[in-house]
A protein has these predicted regions:
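Conserved active-site tyrosine of GNAT-family acetyltransferases
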Residues: 31, 167, 227-232
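Glycine-rich beta-to-alpha transition loops that act as phosphate-gripper elements at the mouths
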Residues: 17-22, 66-72, 88-92, 108-113, ...
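Glycine/Thr-rich beta-alpha phosphate-binding loop at enzyme active sites
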Residues: 36-41, 74, 79-84, 101-103, ...
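Glycine-enriched alpha-helix->loop->beta-strand junction motifs that scaffold or abut catalytic
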Residues: 32-37, 58-62, 80-86, 101-107, ...
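N-terminal beta-strand motif that seeds the catalytic metal site of vicinal oxygen chelate
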Residues: 3-17, 203-228, 234-235
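Conserved small/polar residues in nucleotide/adenosyl-binding loops
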Residues: 240-242
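Conserved N-terminal beta1-alpha1 strand-loop-helix module at the mouth
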Residues: 1-82, 101, 161, 169, ...
Length: 242
């Protein structure tokens, strides 16, 4: 499974801002516990590169990428430190071309027909749409998907736990990005259980997962309770009872 497929399967791409690289592994493990195995660590802080390296070296199940990449220098450093994909807020031909030439997955920000055509010219099929709330959200992406049917979007900015399902349901959406599943304040405070819960909620909302009734066939009550607890851990469908 390639990077693009991993992002689509995850549905939600956490945008992670870390002030201290020592929190990187714990944040990654919290995301994994919530069913999310991709993360975008942004170059908004000086800890970005070291955070990427820490996750790449200690969390083999996590696909870690670099976000807010605005220069070629940042791009090269991110890849050197272990980033498997690059996300940029806008379209910079130098950054995108370097990634394409070096086999690095890249998702540049594209909100206009001109930017989308530039991305397509370099062989891209998935672009970032940022900030989605400012540039028209779903209606704008739907309009752009008319002439650019081969392009899919990863909107960021304006996506949250309440509307993620609406975004994911649109055929032109590849995945969504956002920081609401891993708030910077919760990372700094060590509230990693909350981050895990937010990821589970986001995944359930993205998948449109609802439960009316579950029938569990087990040999005894103890086994059935264990199964129910596992389902609750995965989907937060309610505390299991005998």
């Amino acid at each position: 499974m390639n990077v693009s497929e991993r992002l689509a399967r995850s549905a939600v791409v956490p945008v992670v801002v870390l002030d201290d690289a020592k929190d990187a592994v714990a944040a990654a493990k919290a995301l994994l516990a919530g069913g999310v195995d991709v993360m975008e660590i942004t170059f908004r802080t000086a800890a970005a590169a070291d955070s990427i390296k820490a996750v790449a070296e200690n969390c083999p199940d996590m696909l870690v990428g670099a976000g807010t990449v605005i220069t070629l220098e940042q791009c090269k450093k991110a890849v050197e430190y272990g980033a498997k994909f690059i996300v940029a807020p806008g379209f910079d031909e130098e950054v995108v071309r370097w990634c394409v030439d070096n086999g690095v997955a890249v998702t540049p920000g594209c909100v206009t027909p001109t930017e989308i055509m530039a991305a397509m010219k370099l062989g891209l099929k998935v672009v970032k749409f940022f900030p989605a709330g400012v540039y028209g959200g779903l209606s704008a992406m739907k309009a752009l998907s008319g002439p650019f049917g081969g392009i899919k979007f990863i909107p960021t900015g304006g996506v949250n736990g309440q509307n993620i399902g609406e975004f994911i349901a649109a055929p032109f959406i590849h995945a969504v990005g956002g920081s609401w599943v891993c708030p910077k304040a919760d990372i700094a405070a060590g509230n990693f259980e909350k981050i895990t819960a937010l990821c589970k909620q986001a995944r359930s909302a993205a998948l449109g997962f609802e439960v009316a009734h579950i029938g569990v066939n087990c040999e005894n009550g103890e086994d059935s309770l264990a199964v129910c607890k596992k389902l609750d851990e995965a989907f937060e469908i309610g505390r299991a009872h005998d």
